[in-house]
């Protein structure tokens, strides 16, 4: 990756130019607990909306609460400046339940997002991602 982020971040978004675009327009946070455990990029969307563009946890630390802790850090640090925290993800049985457990609810869908914006098919749990599902939670 051009920014030296390593494989952790790329695991969550295989299209490197998309990651670079997020980084050019956003702010990156790293959760370091005796080594990097989780990374997240947020951007100022519009109309008091803060958006998580990508969040990635080192595989051996997944399921240990690091991503949830990073989301709560963002909520606590931005609630005075924004009213909504938003995230877009593929319609996946892995990610949607995670965000719902973190207090997000489904907001809207962008049809064919992964088809139109990625140069190759993206699969998660054996399912090809097609639409972008947006979820939101109040700050």
Question: Where are these predicted regions, by residue range?
Answer:
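Conserved GNAT acetyl-CoA-binding A-motif
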Residues: 77-91
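Conserved catalytic-core motifs of GNAT/GCN5-like acyltransferases
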Residues: 86-88, 100, 105-126
